[in-house]
Curated annotation (Swiss-Prot):
Binds 1 zinc ion per subunit. Its EC number is 3.4.24.-. The active site is at E429. It comes from Trichophyton verrucosum (strain HKI 0517). Belongs to the peptidase M36 family. CDD domains: M36. This is Probable extracellular metalloproteinase 5. The lineage of its organism: Eukaryota, Fungi, Dikarya, Ascomycota, Pezizomycotina.
């Protein structure tokens, strides 16, 4: 019998705020089952570095050997007499912190909701720990010795009945995987063969229950049902890997608070591009603005730390917080600000994934689920970042290291405005991550640091932000300004509006000769791409929905086709490209994607702004050209 070992470890007094397990969603796909009734209790504790030094100085000073051995010794000392196994997913993070994970066992079986994680600092010493180990009375004998449990098929039927699952098991058979795990073969109605695992689970009343963990993937719900191993009509707890969440936001493509109202959107993710949803990384489900693609939080002091920064948390996954443009100070609406930033960045992730910015291309995800590339690199999203004002930025390291977006408070209006609420700002910044990862390959993040190539980086950001926010009634005579809301100015923060009218926007390729600043050069590049956009829309029409529709791998409208070609061009062009090379890469992208069916539309767009056939690059004396190939004249 294991007694009150937590007291000896100094952990009983700690607040129980670390989640040990994914949390279930609030409904079961319309089947009338309230999963809140089966929700697992939050029963983990966390000991910070300061707590370790104060309460466990001997353990905090442990070092030497490798980090796995050190972490194992920590668990042995803090949980004497308990049995456990190391989970095979330990790693050293980019910050130098080593993370090692353990699962408590009893009589050779997992206690499925009893975990221990040890964090080792880069100095080799214990940084912090968290755990949800069970410390109550233990059964005297292993259940396999007494055969003190039901047939797994009974547990499977019990789960299906209790949760009203539409699974036909009339012809089901059991396939034994190992001593404690089985698979239910011959069923229909689930996405894959259901599975069963004999395991313990720590109950809320401090006792231990022997259960069959029945796993059923129903598509809209992916369930782990903990069915009592003796009374199979009793389900103790249910975990749903599919999270149902609501966000109160300015829904895409609303660009800023002046052009629409906030609304509540439910489950806005695309499971084809974010298979774990936005609030899970495939291992842990979160109840805050954190997931596989991004982690969003306040960063009032502008520091580098983000994991311990404030972010809204909602156990029922309702990220609905008050906001109005006249609210002040900005901290009063930080929950809404973080939520909006998280929503917009994830929308960008999902769209860019559909357009080709996948794992192998170097996108930003913690878990690449076997699709290539390097993981552990979600985007760190800092709302109301205190390191500056009237700006925003994006840091793009090579694939495998997290990107970082910092959006600031803008003081050009009264009251000040948080740039999380201007979608164009978020899209622009995220697009820096896109272009830097694609140009020159995911491992080379330094290909856009020249004046012209860096200018194109700014131009791509404006272009994607502008194209995404087009309205249903827009046409080639529509003009767009970048940053007008945060700047509190109808002129925004660019030289001219984006327009196909040369009187409204006279910029051409040779305009770059008089500019020596990347945003100005970027405005020229985006002005050229804006012509490309409308030439393709005029030919193929415009899809006003939030995602493209593909036919044989090609977007069937001009807007998303333009985005696709520009994105593909980024990956095709050389490191440190010029306008001329980027132009050629886009034309090559169309040749690859559509066999060149848009060649003339592209050339005419480029030529209109002086980037025609005869255009030549010289950093101080660019040569413009309005010529197009003979077949396009």
């Amino acid at each position: 019998m294991h007694g009150l070992l937590l007291a000896a470890a100094g952990l009983l007094s700690l607040p129980l705020h670390v989640l040990a397990h994914p949390q279930p969603s609030t409904n079961l796909a319309g089947r009338g089952v309230d999963l809140d009734a089966y929700r697992m209790a939050d029963r983990s504790s966390y000991m910070s570095s300061d707590d370790m030094k104060l309460k466990q100085p001997a353990i905090a000073s442990l070092s030497g050997g490798n980090y796995v051995d050190t972490a194992t010794e920590v668990v042995k000392r803090m949980m004497p007499g308990m049995t456990f196994r190391m989970v095979d997913d330990h790693y050293v993070g980019e910050s130098g912190i080593s993370h090692v994970y353990f699962r408590q066992t009893m009589h050779g079986m997992d206690i499925d909701n009893a975990d221990f994680n040890v964090n080792i600092g880069k100095d080799g010493k214990v940084l912090s720990v968290g755990h949800s180990f069970y410390t109550g009375p233990a059964p005297d004998k292993a259940p396999v010795e007494k055969r003190d449990f039901s047939d797994p098929m009974q547990a499977f039927h019990g789960a299906c009945k209790a949760l009203n699952l539409s699974i036909n098991s009339d012809k089901a058979t059991i396939q034994t995987m190992n001593e404690h795990e089985v698979m239910f073969m011959g069923t229909s109605g689930a996405m894959s063969d259901p599975q069963g695992k004999l395991c313990y689970m720590a109950k809320e009343d401090g006792t231990l229950a022997l259960t069959w963990r029945v796993e059923t993937d129903m598509g809209d719900n992916w369930l782990l049902s903990y069915v009592d191993a003796k009374e199979t009509d009793k389900v103790h707890n249910v975990v749903d890997y599919v999270s149902h969440a609501t966000y109160q936001v300015y829904k895409w493509p609303i660009p800023d608070p002046t052009e629409g109202k906030r609304e509540i959107v439910e489950n806005p993710w695309n499971l084809k591009t974010s298979p774990f949803t936005w609030i899970s990384d495939g291992k842990t489900n979160y109840t805050t603005t954190r997931g596989n693609n991004a982690i969003a939080q306040a960063n009032f002091d502008g520091g580098e730390d983000y994991l311990n920064n404030y972010r809204p948390d909602s156990k029922n996954l309702k990220f609905e917080y008050p906001y109005a443009p006249n609210m002040s100070p900005p901290k009063s609406y930080i929950d809404a600000s973080v939520t909006q930033l998280f929503y917009s960045a994830n929308m960008v992730h999902d769209l860019y994934y559909m357009l080709g910015f996948t794992e192998k291309a170097g996108n930003f995800q913690v878990n690449n689920h076997g699709q290539g590339g390097k993981g552990n690199d979600f985007v760190i999203l800092n709302a109301q970042d205190g390191s500056g004002t009237n700006n925003a930025n994006f840091a793009t390291p090579p694939d495998g290291k997290p990107g970082r977006m910092r959006v600031y408070i803008w003081t050009k209006a009264k009251p000040s405005r948080g740039s999380s609420f201007e979608a164009g700002t978020v899209i622009h910044e995220y697009t820096h991550g896109l272009s830097n990862r694609l140009c020159g390959g995911p491992a080379n993040a330094g290909c856009l640091n020249g004046m012209e190539s860096g200018g194109m980086g700014e131009g791509w950001g404006d272009f994607f932000a502008t194209a995404i926010r087009l309205k249903p009634n827009d046409n080639r005579n529509s003009n767009y300004v970048h940053g007008e809301w945060v700047n509190n100015s109808p002129k925004g923060n660019r030289l001219y509006p984006y327009s196909t009218n040369l009187q409204t926007n006279p910029l051409v390729y040779t305009s770059c000769n008089k500019y020596n600043e990347v945003h100005a050069i970027g405005t020229v590049w985006c002005s050229i791409l804006y012509e490309v956009l409308w030439n393709l829309i005029d030919k193929h029409g415009k899809n006003d929905g939030p995602t493209p529709v593909f036919e044989n791998g090609v977007p069937n409208d001009g807007k998303y086709l333009a985005l696709k070609l520009v994105l593909d061009g980024m990956a095709i062009q050389p490191c440190k490209p010029t306008f001329v090379q980027a132009r050629d890469a886009i034309i090559d992208a169309d040749m690859n994607l559509t066999k060149g069916s848009n060649k003339c539309e592209l050339w005419k767009a480029f030529a209109k702004r002086g980037l025609g056939v005869g255009a030549k690059y010289d950093p101080k004396n660019r040569t413009g050209s309005k010529a197009v190939p003979k077949e396009c004249q």
